[in-house]
Amino acid sequence: SDPAGGEFLAEGGGVR
């Protein structure tokens, strides 16, 4: 996932 997406994961990510 993308950090700029919004979703915050332990690995550091984001979903748009």
Curated annotation (Swiss-Prot):
Question: Record keywords: Plastid included?
Answer: no
Where is this protein localized, as stated in its record? Secreted
Q: Mainly localized where?
A: secreted
Modification after translation? Conversion of fibrinogen to fibrin is triggered by thrombin, which cleaves fibrinopeptides A and B from alpha and beta chains, and thus exposes the N-terminal polymerization sites responsible for the formation of the soft clot. The soft clot is converted into the hard clot by factor XIIIA which catalyzes the epsilon-(gamma-glutamyl)lysine cross-linking between gamma chains (stronger) and between alpha chains (weaker) of different monomers.
The answer on whether this UniProt entry bears the keyword Ribosomal protein reads no
GO BP term (any one): adaptive immune response
Coiled-coil ranges per UniProt:
none
GO cellular component terms, semicolon-separated? extracellular region
Q: Which UniProt keywords apply?
A: Adaptive immunity, Blood coagulation, Coiled coil, Disulfide bond, Hemostasis, Immunity, Innate immunity, Secreted
> What does the entry note on its domains?
A long coiled coil structure formed by 3 polypeptide chains connects the central nodule to the C-terminal domains (distal nodules). The long C-terminal ends of the alpha chains fold back, contributing a fourth strand to the coiled coil structure.
Q: How does it assemble?
A: Heterohexamer; disulfide linked. Contains 2 sets of 3 non-identical chains (alpha, beta and gamma). The 2 heterotrimers are in head to head conformation with the N-termini in a small central domain.
Q: What does this protein do?
A: Cleaved by the protease thrombin to yield monomers which, together with fibrinogen beta (FGB) and fibrinogen gamma (FGG), polymerize to form an insoluble fibrin matrix. Fibrin has a major function in hemostasis as one of the primary components of blood clots. In addition, functions during the early stages of wound repair to stabilize the lesion and guide cell migration during re-epithelialization. Was originally thought to be essential for platelet aggregation, based on in vitro studies using anticoagulated blood.
Q: What is this protein called?
A: Fibrinogen alpha chain
The record lists the organism as Odocoileus hemionus (Mule deer)
**By which gene is this protein encoded?**
FGA
